[in-house]
From Swiss-Prot:
The protein's enzyme class: lyase
Residues involved in substrate binding: N199, M228, Y257, H293, S313, R314, G315, D354, G355, L356, R357, E393, Y420
Record's protein name: Phosphomethylpyrimidine synthase
GO cellular component term, pick one: cytosol
Length: 585
């Protein structure tokens, strides 16, 4: 008997955080409604009375899952938010698309045992009409401010024209495949909020479709800006379809993983035709950006021989093995213009993979890493000629003193295309805590100009992350990204910090919890020692107690100072009313 598969459940996510509600900021047209999370604040108690604190609105990535008025059926997918915008431009056409094959899900025949859950995903793919280009970069270069750009401007608190200029210049990308209309437009660029990405996906050893969909909804709840499906086991196509149809943020993939599954895991058997078919398959599903390791060139491979950890990128290692087996140049490099044609047909952004990134501190900033970067700069300019959007992937494992060099070189070589880095990890000695070792590097590299940070979970180097690991990784990277925004002086970045600091000083405990990145954990830690409801208004916590709380003492000093000030003012008035005489006769 076949194992019964569960329908992915999102019931636990259909509510907002305590003290918050979903609100929408209206644009210039009725269908531009930009989601934000509004955090209600309690009043400040003073000796003179109560003072109202205005609510704080924060950037929100959770989609309709935290909207109490939304109806969600994961077997049907989310509402097609951008469908009308794409259609009204008049430069796309629908078509039948390719048929799903057994090998798309990792099976050799249609008799393969795969996970099947009934869905109502009626998704007929779109493509650009003959001779048309449908990329956001193309529109931006023509001076067109698209609805996507206006949506982003409202999200970021900037002007639509500024968004258009950044996309036109290549300094920012809007990952928005025309076949992923469910996504809420967002932007990746160093002059915007630093973004984070969360990786999910099954492996040949563990996980299932429902687990991965739940991880996706969990990650966006905690704040991931994009999602990468890195599935390498069975049911890759089906898992990806479920994720994309239910995902309100851009979805990226590494197509070489699925292409390898189609040739039974034998890298030497990969061909351009297999890879091209995989690109089109994923493009039709709606993948918003592809990691493509076109910079791993045959002549660079010997540069990795003396490394401590060799080639640590899965995609990089696959292509290096293919190049050596055939003693030919990387077919992703030789067919790069062909790939550009596919990308511009669906508006898929390049995430040019760093297949030779350092996998250890000892290998950081070496010849192999920077040789590949030179090729990525070359490929960036080719893609831009096709009006295809590009971001550049970066390391990896880099000690703190070598981080800035990575950003400086990338900016120069890749003409300021957005940088997207994995960490970097700043030390190699902390398995189980690499969300911390990497968040240190992520905060620094974000400050220096990296546009998006790929999260690392506590399971890095140890195993496939579960739901709780995803939460840990996302929160660690939200901290890093926000710290970078503060350091760069991003408009409004400090507003939430100031609100929380004020709530902390005024002992408004619930406001402190609600304003934090992880309200549930903040309250749980507080309640471990002071669970009573009265403790939520107490002027101390269990760390210092009522007599040693520095903030309580500060309040006392302020009150005393106010009394002294009033007494001094009283004496001054008496002095003046007495004729301002210093001595009396």
């Amino acid at each position: 008997m076949k194992e019964k598969k569960n329908i992915p459940t999102t019931q636990s996510l259909l509510s907002s955080f305590d003290g918050s509600r979903k609100v929408y900021e209206k644009g210039s047209r009725p269908d531009i409604l930009v989601p934000k999370r509004e955090i209600a604040l309690t009043q400040t108690v003073t000796q003179a009375g109560m003072i109202q604190n205005e609510p704080i609105r924060v950037y929100d990535t959770s989609g309709p899952y935290t909207d109490e008025h939304a109806h969600i059926d994961v077997t049907k997918g989310l509402n097609r938010l951008r469908a009308a915008w794409v259609e009204e431009r008049g430069d796309t056409e629908s078509y039948e698309g390719r048929h799903v094959k057994p090998e798309d899900n990792g099976y050799r025949s249609r008799n393969g045992s795969h996970q099947h859950i009934h869905t109502d995903f009626h998704h007929k793919p779109l493509r650009a009409k003959q001779g048309a280009c449908v990329t956001q970069m193309h529109y931006a270069k023509k001076g067109i401010v698209t609805p996507e750009m206006e949506f982003i401007a409202l999200r970021e608190g900037l002007s639509p024209e500024f968004v258009r200029e950044e996309v036109a210049s290549g300094r920012a990308v809007i990952p928005a495949n025309i076949n992923h209309p469910e996504s809420e437009p967002m932007i990746i660029g160093r002059n915007f909020h630093v973004k984070i990405n969360a990786n999910i996906g099954n492996s040949a050893v563990t996980s299932s479709i429902d687990e991965e969909v739940e991880k996706m909804t969990w990650a966006i709840r905690w704040g991931t800006d994009t999602m990468m499906d890195l599935s390498t086991g069975k049911d890759i196509h089906t898992t990806r379809e479920w994720i994309i149809r239910n995902c309100p943020v851009p979805v990226g993939t590494v197509p070489i993983y699925q292409a390898l599954e189609k040739v039974n895991g034998v890298a030497e058997d990969l061909t351009w035709d297999v890879y091209r078919d995989t690109l089109i398959e994923q493009a039709e599903q709606g993948v918003d950006y592809f990691t493509i390791h076109a910079g791993v060139r045959l002549r660079y491979i010997p540069l990795t021989v003396d490394r401590v950890t060799g080639i640590v990128s899965r995609g990089g290692a696959i292509m290096a093995r293919w190049c050596l087996a055939h003693h030919q140049e990387n077919f992703l490099y030789t067919h790069f213009e062909d790939i550009c044609e596919i990308m511009k047909t669906y508006d898929i952004a390049f995430s040019l993979g760093d297949g030779l990134r350092p996998g250890s501190i000892a290998d950081a900033n070496d010849e192999a890493q920077f040789a590949e970067l030179e090729t990525l700069g070359e490929l960036t300019e080719i893609a831009w000629k096709h009006d295809v959007q590009v971001m550049i992937e970066g390391p990896g494992h880099v000690p703190m003193d070598k981080i800035k060099e990575n950003v400086d070189k990338q900016m120069e070589i890749c003409k300021e295309a957005p940088f997207y880095t994995l960490g970097p990890l700043t030390t190699d000695i902390a398995p189980g805590y690499d969300h911390i070792t990497s968040a240190i590097g992520a905060a620094m590299i974000g400050w220096y100009g990296t546009a998006m940070l790929c999260y690392v979970t506590p399971k890095e180097h140890l195993g496939l992350p579960n739901k709780e690991d995803v939460r840990e990784g996302v929160i660690a990277y939200k901290i890093a990204a926000h710290a970078a925004d503060l350091a760069k002086g991003h408009p409004a970045a400090q507003k939430r910090d100031d609100a929380l600091s004020k709530a902390r000083f005024e002992f408004r405990w619930r406001d402190q919890f609600n304003l934090s990145l992880d309200p549930e954990r903040a309250m749980a830690f507080h309640d471990e020692t002071l669970p009573a409801e009265g403790a939520k208004t107490a002027h101390f916590c269990s760390m210092c107690g009522p007599k040693f709380c520095s903030m309580k003492i500060s309040h006392d000093i302020r009150n005393q100072s106010e009394e002294v000030k009033k007494e001094m003012e009283k004496k001054a008035k008496e002095f003046i009313s007495g004729g301002s005489q210093i001595y009396s006769s």
